[in-house]
């Protein structure tokens, strides 16, 4: 298992420092790491192996691998692999929602803590991380769940295409709403997050285009092979 650091994290730290929001950023990073641990635990339970851990400006990102024999078994069992991937994607946001629920429940029994700073920030931070990650923009958790569900319904090829269209549409709408919000809230953090989402979207568009080109190339080679076989058979 390899560990990599996204150097853009230092840019985020600098931007949050100059905007006097570094404490909030550190707190969000802590709960973002807990969020990712939810993915890891779910992956281990479902017999996936952590392959790479990447430290990014919005927390950790864990890539999983699966044994080739077990992978073939899962493929043969139809949509089991897609369901498991969707469960792993949901595990992170559910972890944050669970933490918020526990803290809220604790506050119901001990009402004096409801007005403390830490109580409100823990709830706010975890709800923010959960809702942010559930946005249907790939490769966010919501986008991953969407892709796996669409894969089950329509198949792999159409799932990628529809996920790409939905992701881009949602991101454009989110950018428009955020632009309006900045005028009233005057919080540069919103701008930073939107910019990072666009960066992720551009990276995924490039991967999507590369994937399509490879699929077209493979399809072209297969068609040529079939044509050669047919012509040889005819002779």
What would you call each of these model-derived segments?
Residues 1-23, 67-68, 80-96:
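Topogenic membrane-insertion module of multi-pass membrane proteins
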Residues 3, 17-76, 121-125, 135-140, ...:
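Small-residue-rich helix-interface/hinge motifs
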Residues 7-10, 91-102, 166-176:
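Core segments of transmembrane alpha-helices
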Residues 12-13, 24-33, 122-126, 181-201:
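Hydrophobic core segments of alpha-helical transmembrane domains in multi-pass membrane proteins
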Residues 20, 91-127:
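Membrane-anchoring/interfacial helices and their immediately flanking loops
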Residues 35, 55, 92, 133, ...:
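Divalent metal-coordination and catalytic microenvironments
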Residues 46-55, 142, 206-219:
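A cytosolic-side transmembrane-helix exit/cap motif
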Residues 148, 152-235:
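C-terminal transmembrane module of polytopic alpha-helical membrane proteins
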């Amino acid at each position: 298992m390899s560990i990599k650091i996204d150097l853009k994290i230092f840019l985020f730290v600098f931007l949050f420092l100059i905007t006097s929001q570094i404490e909030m950023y550190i707190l969000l990073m802590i709960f973002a790491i807990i969020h990712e641990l939810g993915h890891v635990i779910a992956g281990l339970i479902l017999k996936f192996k952590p392959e790479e851990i990447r430290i990014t400006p919005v927390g950790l990102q864990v890539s999983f691998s699966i044994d080739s024999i077990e992978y073939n078994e899962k493929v043969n069992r139809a949509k089991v692999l897609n369901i498991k991937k969707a469960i792993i994607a949901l595990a992170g946001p559910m972890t944050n929602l669970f933490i918020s629920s526990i803290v809220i429940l604790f506050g119901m029994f001990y009402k004096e803590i409801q007005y403390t700073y830490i109580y409100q920030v823990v709830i706010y931070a975890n709800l923010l991380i959960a809702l942010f990650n559930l946005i249907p923009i790939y490769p966010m958790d919501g986008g991953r769940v969407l892709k796996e569900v669409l894969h089950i319904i329509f198949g792999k090829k159409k799932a990628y295409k529809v996920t790409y269209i939905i992701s881009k549409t949602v991101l454009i709408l989110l950018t428009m709403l955020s632009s309006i919000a900045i005028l009233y809230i005057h919080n540069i953090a919103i701008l930073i997050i939107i910019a990072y989402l666009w960066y992720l979207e551009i990276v995924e568009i490039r991967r999507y285009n590369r994937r399509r080109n490879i699929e077209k190339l493979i399809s072209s080679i297969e068609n040529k092979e079939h044509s050669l076989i047919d012509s040889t058979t005819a002779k």
